[in-house]
Amino acid sequence: MKKHRKKRSSSTQVQALAQHICMSAHKARRVIDQIRGRSYEKTLMLLELMPYRASYPILKLVYSAAANASHNKGFNKADLVISQAEVNGGTIIKKLKPRARGHSYPIKRPTCHINIVLKDQSKTKTQQDFVLENKGVFKDTIIERYPEKEREREREINFFKRLLRFPNWNRDK
């Protein structure tokens, strides 16, 4: 059976994947949540100072992703930002611990898969690029998807504008 993978924009993104890390996924997520969205240099400083065991394999993975970016794509490491970082549960390694009188206790070692995607910040599209692509018409996708929210926001703005016309509206006489 083939696994369908997400297609990534190859022009501005680079990824690195570490599989079968002997650590539970929720302990690794505690560290990953701190670095998501940060720049490459700030991430390195954070990971070196964090007191968690999960920070070392994640640090190695961020180094690897940055090396992929500079070697394969020619990106500058100072412009890299962690755009996506995810931790998925892996297989559970099951062992038996021998105990007294021929008994044994099961030992379960959880593993996880860590995926980090770095994005080159200098090559991201600006608003001006979107305007040029749409032939001079800039479309805000959030407003298009939720027109009722935009109308509600305009009503609130108009309400406060009306209140500002009367500066003494709440003053007691």
Swiss-Prot record:
Record flagged with keyword Ion transport: no
Any one biological process term the GO annotation gives: translation
Compartmental location: Plastid, Chloroplast
Keyword Hydrolase assigned: no
Keywords associated with the record: Chloroplast, Plastid, Ribonucleoprotein, Ribosomal protein, RNA-binding, rRNA-binding
Subunit structure and binding partners: Part of the 50S ribosomal subunit.
Family as reported in the entry's similarity comment: Belongs to the universal ribosomal protein uL22 family.
Protein name per UniProt: Large ribosomal subunit protein uL22c
Organism of origin: Drimys granadensis
Gene behind this protein: rpl22
